[in-house]
């Protein structure tokens, strides 16, 4: 299994979630976060924002589905402007459902 963490623009979060659902990946967690990337914040005239609001999406999928999920997020979250986000993929050793105590996805 893989954990996909996508840091995206908040205004694209619904579009990305809908695209993932349409592609067969309805399960996700969304978290409002703030942070900065390589650009170290953003300046508008004389106002400087050190940290920028983003949305983090967490999705756990089978190994074979990871690249497809990355493609869906990349396409649906794209604006072409600085700050579109970043996607991270990590291995997941196991998953358990709390209610049923079932193991796996």
Curated annotation (Swiss-Prot):
One of its GO terms (cellular component) is cytosol. It holds the Pfam family P-II. Keywords: Nitrogen fixation, Transcription, Transcription regulation. The keyword Transcription regulation applies. InterPro entries: N-reg_PII, N-reg_PII-like_a/b, N-reg_PII/ATP_PRibTrfase_C, N-reg_PII_CS. Gene3D superfamilies: 3.30.70.120. One of its GO terms (biological process) is nitrogen fixation. One of its GO terms (molecular function) is ATP binding. Could be involved in the regulation of nitrogen fixation. PANTHER family: NITROGEN REGULATORY PROTEIN P-II, PII-LIKE PROTEIN GLNBI. Belongs to the P(II) protein family. This is Nitrogen fixation nifHD region GlnB-like protein 1. It comes from Methanothermobacter marburgensis (strain ATCC BAA-927 / DSM 2133 / JCM 14651 / NBRC 100331 / OCM 82 / Marburg) (Methanobacterium thermoautotrophicum). The gene is glnBA.
